């Protein structure tokens, strides 16, 4: 069985791409058709590529790898934090700070400062300081927490990045490429897929689509960490046979507005 069914993808709106005037021609192989100026993503391919991404992330986790979930757009922030936390991994869901990967030592110093400020708030140090100074330190702590809280306990540079909308997260993509860190990403029709190692063709603007696929990547981490190989994902060829006829008809009906 595939990790995600065609029905789940349709219900989450994964098939809706961007307007045709805002496309990247390199995404053409993953486009099913066009409707009312919107590209419709080929979900038959998405089903198979989610399986590939799932197995990839699962294998990284099984080897003790670190997975960093990245998504700073509003539609992704909650899912990124919740699913990364559920999987026992790390996340960036607000602004990506330049150098997060390529200048990790500096980032670690800021994380140390965050931990220091947290300790000061907990051990009563703030109670002995002037109110104005406490206000300044509290504001500093909140800012650091916002940007670094999701990687506060990350032990090292991650082994893989999972990104929602790499078109928006270009700095993260470039840093990962510079350090040869593989990227798994939800890639919409306006994005260059060549920058991504394992792509998942998908609507990256719909909250339900982001939540569905991000949750599956978290599931992959959890399964990998548990070493549960008894629930193997079906090979891509078998998946194609399972979804090709009936599910493609569902997609056509959805695109054409039929019941």
From Swiss-Prot:
Asked if Coiled coil is a keyword of the record, the answer is: no
Biased composition of type Acidic residues is found at: 238-248
Q: Please note every region of biased composition (Polar residues).
A: 250-259
UniProt-listed CDD domains: RPS2
Which residue ranges does the record annotate as region Disordered?
224-259
Q: Which UniProt keywords apply?
A: Ribonucleoprotein, Ribosomal protein
Give TM segment ranges: none
User: Organism's domain of life?
Assistant: Bacteria
Q: Which GO terms describe its cellular component?
A: cytosolic small ribosomal subunit
Any Pfam family: Ribosomal_S2
Q: Biological process GO terms, please?
A: translation
Instruction: Cite the GO molecular-function annotations of the record.
Output: structural constituent of ribosome
The answer on whether this UniProt entry bears the keyword Ribonucleoprotein reads: yes
Protein family membership = Belongs to the universal ribosomal protein uS2 family.
Q: What is this protein called?
A: Small ribosomal subunit protein uS2
Instruction: List the source organism.
Output: Limosilactobacillus fermentum (strain NBRC 3956 / LMG 18251) (Lactobacillus fermentum)
Q: Which gene encodes it?
A: rpsB
